[in-house]
Amino acid sequence: ALNEVIEKYNESQPNVTAVPSYDSSGTLLAQIEEGAACDVFFSAAQKQMDTLQNDDQLVVDGTRHNVVNNQVVVITYKGSGTAVTGLENLKDAKNIAMADGSVPVGKYTRQALVNAGILDAVDDVSTIPTDVVSQALGGVEINECANVSAVKTQVAEGSNEVGTVYYSDTYGLEDKLDILQVVSYDLTGNVIYPIAQVKNDEADELEQKAALDFVNFVKSDAAKTIFDSYYFDTNVED
């Protein structure tokens, strides 16, 4: 979706080159903290943005905005014949692909399992180890993945029977994946993606201005139309 948003932005700003870097929000945050050049951070969760803003003091004041909401879905590959219908009987899977707790989709999956009464509540669900999740699901084998793309790939290729990803991750894979359950916000909480301009001492004034302009475009109606088409929920409060 972001590639298409960038293309749309370049229709009116052809002289601006936006170079996206895709990975889990935790990995991207770590790269920024380690000094990687970055002008804009678009996170799949509030936690990483909170860290960048409050702990690292690297968010430009007044530039943080909520862009989209997303939903966690339980997926399987076409023709899997799985007995799983959703989180409530996830234990019936032969094996599961699941992101670790440091990855937003892994955190939201754990939160949903806590709220569904499958996992015990803890102060920070992102700290729940994958082996504890496995035990709560009757010892089912879990393939711990480093990011949501890895989960999607493992299930689409049939390496794992089921997995949890974002609804938007199923875009373009409708012929390979079946959605078993769209997990309600009541279980996961909101899955808000915030965006902000990042303080970058290496950027000149023109680059900083372009970064802010791009942030503002991402929350525009033109960008929302694109996000909607990729199964994101754009009905969010800023």
Label every PLM stretch briefly:
Residues 1-13, 26, 33, 46, ...:
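Exported/periplasmic ABC-transporter solute-binding proteins
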Residues 20-30, 37-53:
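Ligand-binding clamshell of periplasmic/extracellular solute-binding protein-like
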Residues 13-20:
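A generic structural motif
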